[in-house]
């Protein structure tokens, strides 16, 4: 099935004025093919039915991979990095390929964004931004790889000592459905840039854009076999990747329970693993905050992407002196948010990725209400007829008095914010840190010494002050506590796909004295 087979009605909603005909091969986006060891072939695994969450209609089907494909992909990946010379290619030569991948992504932003919007429901403005960010990631990694240096370390004898970095081999990349092209780029670009092969497993709910990225990598001149893309279920294909003895490292983004299970397997193999996991991030409004800025930032932080974001600022702590005024403003602004399909440029809150996920979010809210949470807005599936066919959920604000309520402790991964009052800094820090997660935090205040104090006191990998959900590929990203293990992005993120090696080179030109050879006796 191709994009154009979706019909004129769909195409009329693509607001770009550009053709959506694929630039490389007509219909390539939805070909029923997976990418194993440099070859496109029909999968023999279970059938994936891709549903447009704004209409409930199946727009494409794909046969997924099976465990045997993992063996093929890893074996070919190992050969490919060696035989193609990818691992030994000079950094500026690898960088040239990454630059071309970035340029091709940029040239195809509309194509990629449209594909991802159909697959995930997200707004086109968001999927365009994700595609541009993926291009920027490849360019950043290209520049960083080309300029990375090893070290000549201070010597303690007659030898030259060096610290160098080498590729690891084949990297397993396992990603979730919420921001596919950006998650892929964040893992695949540094892993390739470091000279590795990659076996990528995209999620069942959003496999297409990763397959499209593989076609772009092929066009950019990435040697055959260096990248494989194996869509399929996590419990079979994903599990086989993590357990495979030829996989040197796994980089995973997804839920905390899944990440913990993968970490056990990695421990058995003594294999490094990077985990980017779930969150329940606090966002904090002090009485001296610019309230317009805070309302806009908090809404963006929790309701953009329909709340399907690991860093969603889902616990909103408001100083008691402004609690009523601030919450009223937040509720009024939230009620005015525009719901609709991701293809409509007016849409702020698009459908959720899948009906079953929407229903889980709805059930969690219902349960919270039974346990005493008060619904300040939303709290239900919208009843507007125009939204009846999509996986929509109203942006919701719940009020609870106590951060120990289950709804304050569990990740919802939907458009649901919980407001809680606080009295002073120590009460706030105790409550904000009272969760198993430690991913992100937002602070809204004009008192900068206070912003500094609280930023240091909160257990989170990222803290935003008077802004939220802003990212830079050059700035490391990591989660504390149950939110993750290891770091992505930045130069350290690239190094995490390399083995460090120390080399000692003798400069004396003499046998070591201990051996007492004829010359030194
Ligand atoms: P998930 O854990 O269900 O799945 C993530 C990926 O892991 C999918 O590709 C899935 O098929 C695969 N998988 C599942 N079981 C597996 C197994 N046993 N072995 C190997 N692979 C397996 O998560 P999800 O529902 O796709 O994504 C939502 C979660 O991701 C949320 O918890 C969210 O917070 C988290 N997330 C975290 C970040 C971050 O950077 N910290 C970013 C985005 C999403």
What are these model-derived regions, one by one?
Residues 58-65, 82-86, 173, 283-286, ...:
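Short, well-ordered beta-strand elements within core beta-sheets of diverse protein domains
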Residues 257-402, 465, 512-513, 519-521:
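ALDH superfamily catalytic-core signature
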Residues 81, 85, 102-109, 113, ...:
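Structural signal for hydrophobic packing residues in well-ordered secondary-structure cores
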């Amino acid at each position: 099935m191709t994009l154009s087979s979706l019909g004129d009605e769909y195409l009329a909603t693509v607001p770009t004025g550009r053709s959506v005909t694929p630039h490389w091969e007509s219909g390539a986006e939805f070909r029923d093919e997976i990418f194993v060891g440099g070859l496109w072939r029909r999968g023999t695994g279970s059938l994936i039915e891709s549903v447009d969450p704004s209409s409930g209609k199946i727009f494409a089907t794909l046969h997924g991979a099976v465990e045997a494909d993992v063996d093929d992909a890893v074996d070919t990946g190992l050969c490919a990095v060696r035989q193609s010379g990818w691992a030994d290619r000079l950094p500026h030569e690898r960088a040239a390929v990454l630059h071309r991948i970035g340029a091709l992504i940029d040239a195809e932003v509309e194509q990629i964004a449209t594909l991802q919007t159909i697959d995930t429901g997200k707004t086109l403005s968001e999927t365009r931004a994700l595609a541009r960010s993926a291009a920027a990631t490849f360019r950043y990694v290209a520049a960083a790889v080309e300029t990375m240096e090893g070290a000549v370390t201070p010597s303690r004898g007659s030898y030259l000592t060096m610290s160098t970095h080498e590729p690891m081999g084949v990297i397993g990349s396992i990603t979730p459905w919420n921001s596919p092209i950006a998650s892929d780029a964040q893992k695949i670009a540094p892993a390739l840039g470091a000279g590795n092969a990659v076996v990528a497993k995209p999620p069942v709910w959003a496999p297409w854009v990763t397959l499209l990225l593989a076609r772009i990598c092929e066009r950019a001149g990435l040697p055959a076999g260096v990248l494989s893309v194996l869509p399929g279920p996590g419990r079979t294909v994903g599990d086989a990747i993590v357990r495979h003895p030829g996989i040197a490292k796994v980089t995973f983004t997804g839920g905390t329970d899944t990440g913990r299970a993968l970490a056990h397997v990695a421990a058995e193999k003594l294999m490094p693993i990077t985990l980017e996991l779930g969150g329940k991030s606090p966002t904090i409004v002090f009485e001296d905050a610019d309230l317009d800025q805070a309302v806009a930032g908090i809404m963006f932080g929790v309701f953009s992407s329909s709340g399907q974001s690991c860093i969603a600022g889902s616990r909103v702590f408001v100083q008691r002196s402004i609690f009523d005024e601030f919450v009223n403003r937040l509720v009024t602004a939230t009620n005015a948010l525009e719901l609709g399909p991701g293809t409509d440029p007016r849409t702020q809150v698009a459908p959720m990725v899948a009906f079953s996920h929407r229903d889980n979010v709805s059930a969690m809210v219902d349960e919270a209400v039974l346990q005493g949470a008060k619904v300040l807005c939303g709290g239900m599936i919208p009843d507007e007829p125009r939204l009846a066919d999509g996986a929509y959920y109203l942006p919701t604000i719940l009020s609870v008095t106590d951060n120990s309520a289950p709804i304050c402790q569990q990740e919802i991964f939907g458009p649901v914010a919980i407001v809680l009052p606080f009295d002073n800094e120590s009460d706030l820090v105790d409550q904000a840190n009272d969760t198993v997660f430690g991913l992100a935090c937002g602070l809204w205040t004009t008192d900068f010494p206070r912003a500094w104090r609280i930023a240091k006191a909160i257990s989170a990998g990222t803290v935003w002050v008077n802004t939220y959900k802003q990212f830079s590929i050059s700035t490391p990203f990591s989660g504390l506590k149950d939110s993750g293990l290891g770091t992505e992005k930045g130069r350290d993120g690239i190094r995490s796909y390399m083995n460090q090696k120390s080399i000692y080179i003798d400069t004396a030109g003499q046998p070591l004295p201990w051996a007492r050879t004829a010359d030194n006796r």
